[in-house]
Structure formats: C-alpha cells, structure tokens
Amino acid sequence: NPKRIAFVEGEDMRVLRATQILVDEGLAKPILIGRPLVIEKRIKRLSLRLKEGTDFEIIDPNKDNRYSSYWHAYHQLTERKGISPEVAKILTRTSPTIIGALTVHLGDADTMICGAIGRYHIHLDHIRQIFGSTPENSNELAALGVLIREDGVLFICDPYVNPNPSLEQICQMTLMAVDQVRRFGVTPKVALVSHSSFGAGMTESACKMRQATAWLHANVPDIEVEGEMHADAALSEVIRQQIFPNSKLQGQANLLIMPCLDSANIAFNMAKSLWNALTVGPILMGCSKPVHIVTPSVTPRGLVNMAALAVVDADSKLV
C-alpha cells in the first residue's frame, strides 16, 4: 500500500504538481492540508487530473471532524511547554505544520513534508515540540544536504539545524550522517572540515573538529574519517597527501562535516549553484518520526524526490 504523505502547504502549486506526479507513479497517497475550494481551483488552473477522495485527501484546517482530537493531543504534548488549552485550539486551527505533525503523531499519515513556505526554524520548532528525537540520538537533530552530480554524490552536514554545534553534537551528527549516506548505497568517506588542517590552527572551532576526529577514530574505527582539514584537502587526495600523507581517508571525501551552520549552508548553496547539481533534502536526521522540512526554493521535482525519500524513511521506522 502506498504510504500516506501529509503535505503541509497543500494549496501551493508546486505541491499540487508534485501530487500529480506521485499519484501517476503510484509512489504515495498524498494528504493535502488546505482549503478545499482553493485546492480545487488551482488543480483546474494547472489542468491537473487529480480527484479528491480518489487520488488524494484534504484536511481543511477550518472544518475537519478530527479537530477536537487533534487539539487535545497537541495540548497533551505541550501543556508543560507553556501551551494552554485555548492556545492549543488556536494553533491547531492556524498552523498547518502543527496539523501535519499531528496527522503523523496520531497515525492518520505515515510521513510529513513541510517548509515550501515559511522559515525553516519555525517548522523545526513545531516538529521538536511534537516529536522530539529518537533516544539513541541523544536528543539531537541535524540536517543533511545532498548534491548529486554525474561523477558522484556529495553530502554536507549540517546546513540548517545547529548554529554552532558542540563537540558532542559534531560527533553525533557525523554518526547520523554516516547512517544516512549508507542508506543511499554509498560508502561514507568522511572529512571534518575546518579553516585549519591537521593541527595547524588552535582556534576553538579547529580544536572542536580535531577532538571530534579523535573521538570518532577511537569509538567508531570502522568509519573512514579524517580531520580536521581544509575543504580542498577533503576533495583532493593529491592535496591531502602533500599535507598529511598518513591520512586515514583514501580518495575523495563524499561526506563533509562542517563546524557551524554558516559554513555548511554557504558551502551547500554555493556548490549547488556552481555545479548545477540535483539536490535532495535537506534531510532531517534524528527525529523520532519520518518528517522532513524542505526550503522555499524547492521545485515540484524536488518535492517528489523528498517524498520518495520520506517513504523509504517511513518504511525504515516501522516497528
């Protein structure tokens, strides 16, 4: 049976185009959160062949018989986080992201995609409120950007979630990213990137990446990981061998762990533009449920790619 995907921005034309592709290819059963009349008019404007009830379901924030159970569930989850019953009622009517998250929490959807409209961290805050993280990930979430080119795949972590990750967070996000890279059928080759190469710098950031590398070498010796190093050394074995011939990393790194959100986001968006690469994600890692946040620049095909990944994610999290 196709997995049920709740699309938070159900009225968005990109979401509607993606819904048509998902239905045509039998990849998922979309659930669109939005006003039925608006969705119907836009389907006609786009000349799509979608039929409510047959191809997709609509959750109308203004009129849905699950409203009472949803706001009660939301209040139960957040009553010790400053959310009163009245506020819970209002937010469950007015926040599509909260509604979408509750569909997954209550079993009405298998996975959720949001972020086509609005700021990433607002969506992230709602997801953290309702789901949190898996116990094995020590309450940490992180994002992974994926760049696909003809000559291979490059993963960059963490371009969206953690502004200035601690040593412990760097180690944890590396382990999560390694697991995600393996799900793509790729053997991870990890570089912890810095302005410093192999002990040359003594800034707090360089020391953090150096210590994280040492921890990874000691605790997960089966992972091919090296650091700290410049980005050019990570991507060129020739440069790396000139600087540090005894590197544990062989060949070109395909997973770059960045010291902060600024460096990761800049690198990801610069590489995306310069290489004209196909992007997947960002993939939200560490969440207890298979939910993901895209960005406002996402295309219909990007939403389809994210939906396909979310379906696989939902399958892997089935108990």
Short names for language-model regions:
Residues 1-319:
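Anion-binding alpha/beta catalytic cores of soluble intermediary-metabolism enzymes, centered on
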